[in-house]
Amino acid sequence: MAMAGADGPTAGAAAAVRWRGGESLLLLLLRWPSSAELVAAWGAARASAVAPALAAASAACLALSAMLLADAVLMAAACFARRRPDRRYRATPLGAGAGADDDDDDEEAGRVAYPMVLVQIPMYNEREVYKLSIGAACGLSWPSDRLIVQVLDDSTDPTVKGLVELECKSWGNKGKNVKYEVRNTRKGYKAGALKEGLLRDYVQQCNYVAIFDADFQPEPDFLLRTIPYLVRNPQIGLVQAHWEFVNTSECLMTRIQKMTLHYHFKVEQEGGSSTFAFFGFNGTAGVWRISALEEAGGWKDRTTVEDMDLAVRAGLKGWKFVYLADVKVKSELPSNLKTYRHQQHRWTCGAANLFRKVGAEILFTKEVPFWWKFYLLYSFFFVRKVVAHVVPFMLYCVVIPFSVLIPEVTVPVWGVVYVPTTITLLHAIRNTSSIHFIPFWILFENVMSFHRTKAMFIGLLELGGVNEWVVTEKLGNGSNTKPASQILERPPCRFWDRWTMSEILFSIFLFFCATYNLAYGGDYYFVYIYLQAIAFLVVGIGFCGTISSNS
């Protein structure tokens, strides 16, 4: 009876569990491994798969870092030993009869001295800046009968189109030769507008074309300082000026951008100009010889970096480029984080996609020597357009944080400290006025490398969004005292609309790695990882740059 009484409640409880559908749960709990078994399983997986994979990634990143360092050293050396353009090329000022053989006809000599120049200004709904660029172009010191200002308006806002057309007519009434051109479609975006603009009949009389984006304001003597290089040196196809920024002090993000772009111009552009007479056209603040542009095949819209595409094709035809560091053109930096992201995606994705499209053409062309092809494929494209984006993210945001969790893998000190320090110093040498922003620049650039790496793979593999084109938002002259919200006249956005979960989640991962290293590690990686985690979090919650309704 006692035995039966004991069995009865037990059987009833088991039946109740089965009745509630809990039998499988009980079996799962009974079979669930203990903590010791889990630790042992993780140790085996870590030793057999995770650690070897991380070690391979570390070795690859270190090799790529060495490539970056070598390229940075060579470019820095080229800049310090630079050959000034005015010492390598003839660039005496233009004057009556200058640039032509002896000619008794003063009028004809003057026409040769001041060739016909076309100024193209592509724009798209540029409400805040259209007056700046049109006014600056019309104010260029050049004979009015030798200059045509062509405004290529792709605006979809009828109000903006009306304002731009009215501004063109206003300058036309002042005696300036201003042509207002519109299209029925936006096919090809900027490249399509520039290409169609060159098809106009009046362009046939022009020898050179200067291009300015809508927020660029050339100084009156811009043509007087650039055109002589083209007139005196028939082998030169492009003259590129330096960008100067009117809103550098607007926020920390614009200061960091200025450092990055200053290095790009002072090292990459200047180094390419003085060593190989080649660099990527920046799309604005430059003057092309129209015959060089046409020989290269004209504008193509196959990528979002139509300017670089044109430069590569012109370089393959043997045309030389000149960068003039002392000719500066005022422009505006994007001060809004979302706008800056779109710009960086377009530049990074487009460059990688162009590498994919022209790599074979560069390799098999017979029109340029081997060393020039090697420079273009290895240094210009692979190192600067691929490696430069992958290494900051993979090494400093993935491999190093993961290595604190995997004791079997140790990243050597030279790869963690010496190489990045040397590269940073090479950047700082050309940015002495902003050297105190170097720590912020490093952390912010590592965060942006997350987006650039993704954009690079999209372009290299031609994935979705490869031809995504978003016009960079411009707010007008940096001296404008009105806040951005008043300029844009748009309702403010909610703060959580600016959040990006990818950065926030990545910051959580970095915080975990840093805390683990602080608790169990024998080194001080947690100091850097904590700082990088904070940088990801700050960017992730949108607390970076100025705020507008598009943020």
Swiss-Prot record:
<dbReference type="GO" id="GO:0051753">
    <property type="term" value="F:mannan synthase activity"/>
</dbReference>
<protein>
    <recommendedName>
        <fullName>Probable glucomannan 4-beta-mannosyltransferase 3</fullName>
        <ecNumber>2.4.1.32</ecNumber>
    </recommendedName>
</protein>
<dbReference type="InterPro" id="IPR001173">
    <property type="entry name" value="Glyco_trans_2-like"/>
</dbReference>
<feature type="binding site">
    <location>
        <position position="215"/>
    </location>
    <ligand>
        <name>substrate</name>
    </ligand>
</feature>
<feature type="active site">
    <location>
        <position position="154"/>
    </location>
</feature>
<dbReference type="GO" id="GO:0071555">
    <property type="term" value="P:cell wall organization"/>
</dbReference>
<dbReference type="GO" id="GO:0005794">
    <property type="term" value="C:Golgi apparatus"/>
</dbReference>
<feature type="active site">
    <location>
        <position position="307"/>
    </location>
</feature>
<comment type="function">
    <text>Probable mannan synthase which consists of a 4-beta-mannosyltransferase activity on mannan using GDP-mannose. The beta-1,4-mannan product is the backbone for galactomannan synthesis by galactomannan galactosyltransferase. Galactomannan is a noncellulosic polysaccharides of plant cell wall.</text>
</comment>
<dbReference type="Pfam" id="PF13632">
    <property type="entry name" value="Glyco_trans_2_3"/>
</dbReference>
<feature type="transmembrane region" description="Helical">
    <location>
        <begin position="409"/>
        <end position="429"/>
    </location>
</feature>
<feature type="transmembrane region" description="Helical">
    <location>
        <begin position="525"/>
        <end position="545"/>
    </location>
</feature>
<feature type="transmembrane region" description="Helical">
    <location>
        <begin position="386"/>
        <end position="406"/>
    </location>
</feature>
<keyword id="KW-0808">Transferase</keyword>
<keyword id="KW-0472">Membrane</keyword>
<dbReference type="GO" id="GO:0000139">
    <property type="term" value="C:Golgi membrane"/>
</dbReference>
<dbReference type="GO" id="GO:0047259">
    <property type="term" value="F:glucomannan 4-beta-mannosyltransferase activity"/>
</dbReference>
<dbReference type="InterPro" id="IPR029044">
    <property type="entry name" value="Nucleotide-diphossugar_trans"/>
</dbReference>
<keyword id="KW-0961">Cell wall biogenesis/degradation</keyword>
<feature type="transmembrane region" description="Helical">
    <location>
        <begin position="504"/>
        <end position="524"/>
    </location>
</feature>
<feature type="transmembrane region" description="Helical">
    <location>
        <begin position="60"/>
        <end position="80"/>
    </location>
</feature>
<keyword id="KW-0328">Glycosyltransferase</keyword>
<keyword id="KW-0333">Golgi apparatus</keyword>
<keyword id="KW-1133">Transmembrane helix</keyword>
<keyword id="KW-0812">Transmembrane</keyword>
<comment type="similarity">
    <text>Belongs to the glycosyltransferase 2 family. Plant cellulose synthase-like A subfamily.</text>
</comment>
<feature type="binding site">
    <location>
        <position position="213"/>
    </location>
    <ligand>
        <name>substrate</name>
    </ligand>
</feature>
